[in-house]
Amino acid sequence: MSKPSDRINLTNQFLIAMPNMADPTFSGTVVYLCDHSERGALGLVINRPTDIDLESLFNRIDLKLDIEPLLHIPVYFGGPVQTERGFVLHEPVEGASYNSSMSVDGGLEMTTSKDVLEAVATGTGPKRFLLTLGHAGWGAGQLEEEISRNGWLTVAADPRIVFDTPAEERFEAALGLLGVSSSMLSGEAGHA
């Protein structure tokens, strides 16, 4: 049994799905881990845009969004848990405090309260953000087990991949942080 000090904390890491990922929900995904502890893990898929854009989502929740560059930004599938709930991964806003925010080691925040969307709608919110519906969640030890079965690669997250890289390029960009590409990966695990 490992001591708490022996645990690896994967908060602020990318999980990159391996080709042998058994769960089709996560095939080809990059997950940003917002929280990882002995109780489990919570993350957001960052490379699965949906057909919903900010304008239509804001209309659904009775918020007026008139900032033209934001209207057609896609909302992302964040994972299969709580898919009716919004999760906003964003850079902190100096002097702002949102009702349900969690600071992530590495400088980002995840907010689940509507007030961050109200701030976005008025132009006072975070300038760089990613909005998801749903999140990915793992119980105690579940993620570690999936990693040990070669289901995921892990690498320190880079906010430029989250916010500045087109969604369809995020998987390869995250792999690039490890110095590999998808063509170098095999769906078979082996031992020398």
Curated annotation (Swiss-Prot):
Database matches in SUPFAM superfamilies: VC0467-like
Pfam families reported for this sequence: DUF179 (PF02622)
InterPro entries: AlgH-like (IPR003774)
Any single Gene Ontology cellular-component annotation: cytosol
Domain of life the protein comes from: Bacteria
Xref: HAMAP family: UPF0301
Family named by the database record: Belongs to the UPF0301 (AlgH) family.
Name by which UniProt lists this protein: UPF0301 protein BceJ2315_30870
